Swiss-Prot record:
Record-level GO cellular component terms: cytoplasm; cytosol; nucleus; plasma membrane
Record-given protein name: Heat shock 70 kDa protein cognate 1
GO biological process: chaperone cofactor-dependent protein refolding; protein folding; protein refolding
Composition bias type Gly residues, residue spans: 625-634
Domain of life: Eukaryota
Keywords: ATP-binding, Nucleotide-binding, Phosphoprotein, Stress response
Chain spans, region Disordered: 612-641
């Protein structure tokens, strides 16, 4: 079997997308529902696990056990302020385990809990299966995207999610950079262009300034907010309508998860409508305690409710330009990416910021990131086609990285917006006489004191020979790989003693054992999903066979040929089986198959006799073969005498 190409996956907060570069062009792959983007939702029910459209479609009926927004949890600690505020909006339960958030749901009557990485891995698995259905084989290699402003922990956790999904993650790349590839791929050979990518999605916001020339994409600066997007605009609308409902009907629906979910779905739809119309209506029958909720919202009201959030998107734009040492006039193209850039007010603010300059809407904002990721996947997989062979990506690290020195001071080794991969070394020493060891504490952030920055991890370099303060020399090396993930090494020069850390468990990273366990769990869930599919198939075949028998009884050409006894037998047996089906919807596959065998053993000879007497060929059964043997798409069943 030929080696399948690597795919590019945009793992989004609200929607995900997968693309593949083949025959010199990118194909964005539609899922089994025909949609080119798939909701990043996973649901658990009494009988099955659902991922994507199927999960989102049943969310109002099953809010407690439908997980979304895993990207807002991944790589964060439970006590993170954003996690605490998000929990107020989520209908599912989030609890702390070793300082990390876990999500608890009920599946097949049992309580199960998942780390955000596991939930994201389920979405990645769905994207992988979407690609496999299109490519006709097993996909193992992928490039996965993250917001440019994701920190080290979030990147590492995303890579772990890929591993749990059974993917070999070739590279983690930044979303705006991927979008820039989608924008600039067909512009090779043109003179140098400065491009600003404005990427406002469902849950995250990034701004990147790049220079594109002759296939070289060089990121100059990046800025953003890993917790701002369409979901936040929905939240404002939901809160607004909860208050309106309280005012009008004197009822507080704030604690009713199902009502809130139905309201949120309506708000999301209204928000989209307001991008093309100036008014949207909301009509929800029996929203809460039997009260119908009919109302409307104008675009002006929506803009007022979210005014501070919309205006807040301009600060990262200014910051990225400052860091890139460019002024507004030097930007040639302003490219919009992410579904939330369809909001007219956001476009107006951005255009005003650039003194009326036209915005570039030439790329599909929902698909651009997966498109660029697919191109990068092809390059890393060794694709030699002309379109990509000269393409080079130079990205940057979004946050400054350093260590804590005496007095809790942040000493930066790698400044933000440094091109990656990169390596920096600095010599440190002891601050006390005969100090036996040093504690290397690693932080990321821009503040002067480490307490105000984000701790990534720490490790000890011990057994330093006794010496006066200032004499021992400890060489600390920071090494950032192409994924933006950090390795730190400390070396004591006189003894050659070395210690290193790929920032791991201190910052809530999953251990190797955790990941292996989750890979096994993922396989178990996949098998359970498959068994469920087989079960449904067997049930449908049995149901279909029963109704086929009934339609034969009603067939005007055949009904007169039945003897009363045969008619009675078929009528009785098919009715009994349908009644059994209604009462045993959750029976096992084998039970459905056994029932069908029993029914066929009695009814097939009657039907065959009837058709032979009429000189006609017997009809195909539910499975697609003659009565008396099932087959086709379902499980094969051998007739037993």
């Amino acid at each position: 079997m030929p080696k399948l190409p690597a795919v590019g996956i945009d793992l989004g907060t609200t929607y995900s997308c997968v693309g593949v570069f083949q025959h010199g062009k990118v194909e964005i792959i539609a899922n089994d529902q025909g949609n080119r983007t798939t909701p990043s939702y996973v649901a658990f029910t009494e009988s099955e696990r659902l991922i994507g459209d199927a999960a989102k479609n049943q969310v109002a009926m099953n809010p407690n056990n439908t997980i979304f927004d895993a990207k807002r949890l991944i790589g964060r600690r439970f006590d993170d302020a954003t996690v605490q505020s998000d929990m107020k909006h989520w209908p599912f339960e989030v609890f702390a385990e070793n300082g990390k958030p876990r999500i608890r749901v009920e599946y097949k009557g049992e309580r199960k809990s998942f780390y955000p990485e596991e939930v994201s891995s389920m979405v990645l698995t769905k994207m992988r299966e979407t690609a496999e259905a299109y490519l006709g084989g097993t996909v193992t290699d992928a490039v996965v995207t993250v917001p440019a402003y994701f920190n080290d922990s979030q990147r590492q956790a995303t890579k772990d999610a890929g591993a749990i999904a059974g993917l070999n993650v070739l590279r983690i790349i930044n979303e705006p950079t991927a979008a820039a590839i989608a924008y600039g791929l067909d512009k090779q050979g043109t003179s140098e262009r400065n491009v600003l990518i404005f990427d406002l999605g469902g849950g995250t916001f990034d701004v990147s300034v790049l220079t594109i020339e002759d296939g070289i994409f060089e990121v100059k600066a990046t800025a953003g907010d890993t917790h701002l997007g369409g979901e936040d605009f929905d939240n404002r609308l939901v809160n607004h309508f909860v208050q309106e409902f309280q005012r009008k009907h004197k009822k507080d629906l704030g604690q009713n998860k199902r009502a809130l979910r139905r309201l949120r779905t309506a708000c999301e739809r209204a928000k989209r409508t307001l991008s093309s119309s100036t008014q949207a209506s909301i009509e929800i029958d029996s929203l809460f305690e039997g009260v119908d909720f009919y109302t409307s919202v104008t675009r002006a009201r929506f803009e007022e409710l979210n005014g501070d959030l919309f205006r807040g998107t301009m600060e990262p734009v200014a910051k990225a330009l400052r860091d890139a040492k460019m002024d507004k006039g030097q930007i040639h193209d302003i490219v919009l990416v992410g579904g939330s850039t369809r909001i007219p007010k956001v476009q107006r603010l951005l255009q005003d910021f650039f003194n009326g300059k036209e915005l570039n809407k030439s790329i599909n904002p929902d698909e651009a990131v997966a498109y660029g990721a697919a191109v990068q996947a092809a390059i890393l997989h060794g694709d030699k086609s002309e379109a990509v062979q000269d393409l080079l990506l130079l990205d940057v690290t979004p946050l400054s990285l350093g260590i804590e020195t005496a007095g809790g001071v942040m000493t930066t080794l790698i400044k933000r917006n440094t091109t990656i991969p990169t390596k920096q070394t600095q010599i440190f020493t002891t601050y006390a006489d005969n100090q036996p060891g040093v504690l290397i504490q690693v932080f990321e952030g821009e503040r002067a004191m480490t307490r105000d920055n984000n701790s990534l991890g720490k490790f000890e370099l011990s057994a330093i020979p006794p010496a006066p303060r200032g004499v021992p020399q400890v060489e600390v090396t920071f090494d950032i790989d192409a994924n933006g993930i950090l390795n730190v090494t400390a070396l004591e020069k006189s003894t050659g003693k070395e210690n290193r850390i790929t920032i791991t468990n201190d910052k809530g990273r999953l251990s190797k054992e955790d990941i292996e366990r989750m890979v096994n769990d993922a396989e178990a869930y996949r098998q359970a999903d498959e068994q469920q599919r087989d079960r449904i198939n067997a049930k449908n075949q049995l149901e279909s066979y029963c109704f086929q028998l009934r339609s034969t009884l009603d067939d005007e050409h055949l009904s007169s040929r039945f003897s009363p006894a045969d008619r009675e037998t078929i009528q009785q047996r098919s009715s009994e089986t349908i009644a059994w089906l209604d009462a045993n919807q959750l029976a096992e596959r084998q039970e459905f198959e056994h029932k069908q065998q029993e029914l066929e053993r009695i009814c097939s000879p009657i039907i065959t006799r009837l058709y032979q007497g009429a000189g006609m060929a017997p009809p195909p059964t539910a499975g697609g073969s003659n009565p008396g043997a099932t087959g086709g798409s379902g499980p094969t069943i051998e007739e037993v005498d």
